[in-house]
Amino acid sequence: MKTLILFLVDILFGYVPQAAGCAICLFAVTNQNLRSRKFWLTTGIFSAIAIVIRTAYNINLIDFGFHTIIIWSIFILVAIGYNKVPAMRSICSILLSGIFITDTELITAGSMILIFGSENFTKMMNDTETMDGRIVKAICGIPANILFVIVVLVFYFIKAALKRRKLQKEAQTISENL
């Protein structure tokens, strides 16, 4: 039962929000509409990739750190192949997602250290031997993932507003020149 709980927490509050955040960032960088079916398919593909690669890491097929590089590399290939996004924009969006994820995880870790204390936080993060410890660690990641999605949504809406403003200025310039 605890294995199922960990699996569900990891998927619903870990892989899916991070995949959605990466997809939102990709769509922001390329000025695509989030309401499209392609966004949801991209999120699903990104989630599946992350689940498979992280599972390979969890069963010691991949060393720590390499799983992130592999996941991001495949995300870039999906963005180029499936989403038809130019390579540089794909790379920029995934790297920007990585920066956002790192920042939100640092903010969350700092907050948890303030709340629980450094020693307790370190114990929570290092207790991966027991199923309870792994569940606690997964739950501790939820605030960072929520914050990550909020940050990339803000980024998306700022980019959309800037694009709208630019289009309005161009339309105004054209109408003035007529």
What are these regions (language model features)?
Residues M1-Q18, K137-G141:
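Hydrophobic transmembrane alpha-helical segments in integral membrane proteins
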Residues V9, D132-F155:
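Hydrophobic alpha-helical transmembrane segments
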Residues I11-Q32:
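N-terminal signal-anchor/start-transfer transmembrane helix
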Residues Q32, F46, A50-I51, I71-S97, ...:
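Short helix-perturbing small/polar motifs within transmembrane alpha-helices
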Residues T42-L61:
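A generic, lipid-embedded transmembrane alpha helix
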Residues G98-L114:
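Mid-bilayer segments of alpha-helical transmembrane spans in multi-pass integral membrane proteins
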Residues S118-V136:
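Short, membrane-exposed interhelical loops at transmembrane-helix boundaries
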Residues A161-L178:
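Short, highly charged, low-complexity non-transmembrane loops/tails of multi-pass membrane proteins
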